[in-house]
């Protein structure tokens, strides 16, 4: 009973803090930077609170259930939100303070955690005894690596999508336009113009004491370079996690089912995901720099990851059907 109450408290704290962080984050884009910079840094620190809340939740559930909390969709979503908070903190503690990355990780964390705590998963939060197939020391290694890989690949893919949007977008950021109606504001607010604005505003702040003028194209190019820089490195990290997860899963499958690979839906889509991002890394290696082709491949990979992550859970078939919607 105590563990259950503590889980609910920690979950609500983390979700509430992330919601407040998102509110503060977007409000700071609508007011003067000098007046809002303190609130912006406070919102970044809120992610740290979220990280420790989710960490406490995972440890509490681990102690209560007696196994690592990655046995169903609810727990894996919370762990995925935890992974996004780690990526967010990497940019927070980075000396250059890459706010472009924060614009991706914070909304992703609140969306995933909001879905995990929604009524759609109301039957999953309760801990249960593991099915025999999951009672293995490989559970922590395999599932944690896969979820961390999903988190990093999703984040890197979103940055690549932002790169494509900003590259092909001809209209300047809406923050500089006056007399914007409410409908248009809401439509463009959730486009990647927010990343454009953050970069240009910060660049102007850094140069405000120097009598130099930079064209908007320079800031646009600088932003594209930053997005490409971070997407490549985050996707590379996610690809490493995914590779380790697939290999450890193959060893686990051989111990449990007597075969390293069975081509069930989850394994098939995991292989497709791995192949797509292997192509991405190959293109990046050949390009030796920024490229649209690699960003397109990463954007396709974004959709494939969600199919791989939720496909089996929606269908409830195959060897990985445990923890799915239908099995609960």
From Swiss-Prot:
InterPro entries found in the cross-reference section: Cyt_c_assembly, Cyt_c_biogenesis_CcsA, Cyt_c_biogenesis_CcsA/CcmC
Residue ranges of the TM segments: 13-33, 46-66, 73-93, 101-121, 146-166, 234-254, 263-283, 295-315
One of the record's GO molecular function terms: heme binding
Compartments where found: Plastid, Chloroplast thylakoid membrane
Bilayer topology: Multi-pass membrane protein
One BP term from GO: cytochrome complex assembly
Keywords (A to Z) from UniProt: Chloroplast, Cytochrome c-type biogenesis, Membrane, Plastid, Thylakoid, Transmembrane, Transmembrane helix
Pfam families: Cytochrom_C_asm (PF01578)
Family the entry assigns: Belongs to the CcmF/CycK/Ccl1/NrfE/CcsA family.
Subunit composition and interactions: May interact with Ccs1.
Described function: Required during biogenesis of c-type cytochromes (cytochrome c6 and cytochrome f) at the step of heme attachment.
Name of the featured protein: Cytochrome c biogenesis protein CcsA
């Amino acid at each position: 009973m105590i563990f259950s109450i503590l889980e609910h408290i920690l979950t609500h704290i983390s979700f509430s803090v992330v919601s407040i962080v998102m509110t503060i984050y977007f409000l700071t884009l609508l007011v003067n930077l000098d007046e809002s910079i303190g609130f912006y840094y406070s919102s970044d620190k809120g992610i740290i609170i979220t990280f420790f809340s989710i960490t406490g939740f995972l440890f509490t559930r681990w102690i209560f259930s007696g196994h690592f909390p990655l046995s169903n969709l609810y727990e894996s979503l919370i762990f995925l939100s935890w992974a996004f908070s780690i990526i967010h903190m990497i940019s927070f503690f980075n000396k250059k303070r890459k706010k472009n990355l924060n614009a991706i990780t914070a909304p992703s964390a609140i969306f995933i955690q909001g879905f995990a705590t929604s009524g759609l998963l109301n039957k999953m939060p309760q801990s249960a005894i593991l099915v025999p197939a999951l009672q293995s020391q490989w559970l922590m290694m395999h599932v944690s690596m896969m979820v961390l890989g999903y988190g990093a690949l999703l984040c890197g893919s979103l940055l690549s999508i932002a790169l494509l949007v900003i590259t092909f977008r001809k209209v300047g950021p809406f923050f500089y336009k006056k007399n914007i109606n409410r409908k248009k504001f809401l439509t463009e607010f959730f486009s990647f113009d927010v990343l454009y604005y953050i970069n240009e505003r910060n660049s102007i702040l850094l140069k405000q004491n120097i009598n130099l003028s930079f064209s908007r194209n320079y800031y646009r190019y600088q932003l594209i370079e930053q997005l490409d820089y971070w997407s490549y490195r985050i996707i590379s990290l996610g690809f490493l996690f995914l590779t380790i997860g697939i290999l450890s899963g193959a060893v686990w499958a051989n111990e449990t089912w007597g075969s390293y690979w069975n081509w069930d839906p989850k394994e098939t889509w995991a292989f497709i995901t791995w192949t797509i991002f292997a192509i991405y890394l190959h293109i990046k290696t050949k390009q030796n720099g920024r490229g649209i082709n690699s960003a397109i491949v990463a954007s396709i990979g974004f959709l494939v990851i969600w199919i791989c992550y939720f496909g089996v859970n929606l269908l409830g078939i195959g060897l990985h059907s445990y923890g799915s919607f239908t099995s609960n």
